[in-house]
Amino acid sequence: MHKNEVPSASCTADSSSNVCIEDSYISAGDDLISIKSGWDEYGIAFARPSSGITIRRITGSSPFAGFAVGSETSGGVENVFVEHLNFFSMGVGIHIKTNSGRGGFIRNITISEVTLNGARYGLRIAGDVGGHPDTSYNPNVLPVVDSVTIKNVWGQNIRQAGLIRGIRNSVFSRICLSNVKLYGSASIGPWKCRDVSGGALDVQPSPCTELASTSETGFCTT
């Protein structure tokens, strides 16, 4: 490898269950830690979700994401617990991504105790990410994204707080942001949201209006 090249290898759990990834330093040219479960019609047919995954005490840097789910999640991703992440010089701190045609689900994800020092985006949850393996996929097969909690996040030198962009006919639901504080060296870009419902508590900068106050939702707490 040339001394100026960035290693592309990272750590991916794909169609895996009962996995623990911990106590690691990673520097890569890809998402540092990612969870996947198959790609479009092939992942739907294989039908093996990633579940029961614990990730903790990870430090690292990447031009992409620190922790990611997707975008290939056609077999489903559920019951994921992530804590104590320390990322610097990132593209995106936390990136949850899927697309029309994927199908599957992303649910019961909890991410907490995250420190970011330098990122284009603190957080992205998006339903329009990733290509398709061929033309045989069904664009009407939509993923379900439900019950994603992100809490106790502190970031500095962040260019834009975050983007949460669901799918018109499959709104991302029960998205909870709690004690999420993101600051920029200058004026930080605001949250941008659409096709999402959920709650927000003690979030800086102020969250988008699509995330109702916790008194209206009841599921999003500190």
Model-derived segments and their meaning:
Residues 1-222:
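Extracellular/periplasmic carbohydrate-active domains that bind, remodel
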